[in-house]
Amino acid sequence: MRVQPRPRYRAAASVSFAGFADAVQAARELAQSGLHPANCRLLGPEEALLSGSGDGSRSILVLGFESADHELGPWLARALEICAGHRGEVRDEDSDPAAVWRAVFLRGPHLRDGFVRLGLVAETFETAITWDRFWEFHQGVLAAVRQAVRQACGGGALSCRFAYVYPDGPAPYYSVYAPGRPGQELEQWDQIKLAASEAILALGGTITHHHAVGRDHMPWYRAQRPALFGRALDAAKRALDPAGIMNPGVLTP
């Protein structure tokens, strides 16, 4: 854990792209530019629509910089130059798309619980992949999950956003919303979860990016985890938590 001074300076913008491919290239260049934005989240057109941040025709890049030391105008200006080089536009909006998305994001757990009570099947899954493999991976995941949603629920909505971007690659985060059948929602969810997880591993992604490693992911986590790392984790668990208090039976037996 690292304690940092509270930011005194902030600079932010929302950039829209007519094409998701252009937005992805802009996010990649930003991640590899050395500018180190504090926030660089890409909302695909479906994610923008479902969150109310857009009308579903454009992708939106939520961009922000923070510092406790200096003004950030030059950093933001250079980031916007990069976005403009990939046909990104800062458009005049009645409301700030970033603020709209942030509000929906914070309400997400409450909305999810409400959706479930109304009979909706809701699922999210996050992964990570290198930039050079992203497009094949993304198209494969979309195809597999859409087919599973059609088979399990008759159809639904599927969206994607980049939760994080790194010089090596993005961390795509997918959301699924589909109609449930009373009494069969869990089976429908299982079918979608299985298809998504199998596709992620088959296409070279990681079963989870940095959180949500737990019982739901265990079959794929164990398949992906190197045996040596598993033994090292088991040994550390026995040494540091001999009573098995912390997450018993989750990452290790």
Task: Give short role names for the model-derived ranges.
Residues 214-253:
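Activity-critical C-terminal alpha-helical subdomain
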Residues 203, 210-212, 247:
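Short glycine/serine/threonine-biased micro-segments
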Residues 2-5, 11, 15-195, 199, ...:
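C-terminal substrate-recognition/cap domain of FAD-linked oxidoreductases
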Residues 175-182, 211-219:
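Short, local alpha-helical segments
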Residues 1-6, 207-213:
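FAD-binding core of FAD-dependent oxidoreductases
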Residues 1-11, 143, 222-234:
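Compositionally biased, low-complexity linear motifs
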